[in-house]
Amino acid sequence: MLSYRGVAYDTGTNFATGQGDLSRTVWDESAMEAEISLISDQLNCNSVTVYGTDLDRLAQTATAAIERELHVLLQPRLVDRPVNEIMDHLAEAARLAESLRKQGAKVSLTVGAVHLVFTPGLIEGDTYHERMANVYADAEHYLLKPTARVDVAAAAPRLNEFLAKAAVVARGNFSGSVGYSAAPFEVVDWDPFDTIGLMYQYLPSGQTPAEHKDLVGSYLRWNKPVLISEFGTATYQGAEKKGFFFWDIVDRAQDVPTVLDGYTRDEGEQAAYHLKMFEIFEDAGAAGVTVSEFIHPTHPHSTDPRLDLDTASMALVKTIRDDFSDPASGYRVEPKEAFHAIADHYAHLGFQEIARGGR
């Protein structure tokens, strides 16, 4: 039984998107509260992963989720910054989580995600995008430009030394459950953590159901709850087969980014992928699942297929900007087919849990 049924919610992360300092240029607290209400009341989640860089936004969003009786998995993200800054940022987030916990909130903390890629100094590459390219140096890229090849096994001691320090910082400021969200290619010592999180969308290619079950099942030997921290795929035919590179279908060399030829929007296929994976994850023994992601404002929807960046997005809602070309424009959201399919599935699981006497 998937005890946690959630969605990931980006409050704005300092990725280099080319559309502002954070991945959410527009931030409006009332809009955020409306989106969190959609997550609790219509998507039928009982959990939400709140991640991002700005601590005030994290606090606002976590509070809104708690007010709607959602479990919050708080995940601070600080990309391409020195380790001491990352640790200070984590400590602040941990203190926030502890404050919420003491008020009776259901809150857990993760010390971050995919640090081999997000954090400099652990593998070759000066920037987030360069490190990502290097991890997948042998894959087919359109956007990424590898500058080296990464030996993830050789990088494991550096990663685990970093994670051990992060766990100490987290536990020094927070008394609840502490975890980490790892990409499948990261070789992690899970001893310092209460839960195992898998950033499942980082698989380099599509897998068979048996391969998925074997992968998730391989983590059960740690005797800790295994959570699918994030998973999803984009909104076009064949996206699942591209694995992690579902997003790599946009020509960004032009002034106006355009979807490459040969890709057809298909909301139904995206929805079917999620339903299939829910069954696989439950059969494999996962304790919870988080769909990635609720909204992706840097990828707005357009009725022009060439401009429809939402096609390359995992988001469950379309971002429809007032001014398509302006990242700072206001917007409205419109649920996609995957939203409705997931809502029905989560509602069904919730009814099953109630029938079994669960929470």
Regions found by a protein language model. Give the residues of each.
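Short, acidic/polar
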Residues: 19-39, 86-97, 181-187, 271-278
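Active-site groove signature of glycoside hydrolases
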Residues: 95-156, 179-185, 290
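Hydrophobic faces of well-ordered beta-strands that scaffold small-molecule active sites
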Residues: 3-9, 46-50, 72-76, 107-111, ...
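Aromatic-rich peripheral "rim/lid" segments of glycoside hydrolase catalytic domains that contact
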Residues: 5-8, 21, 291-359
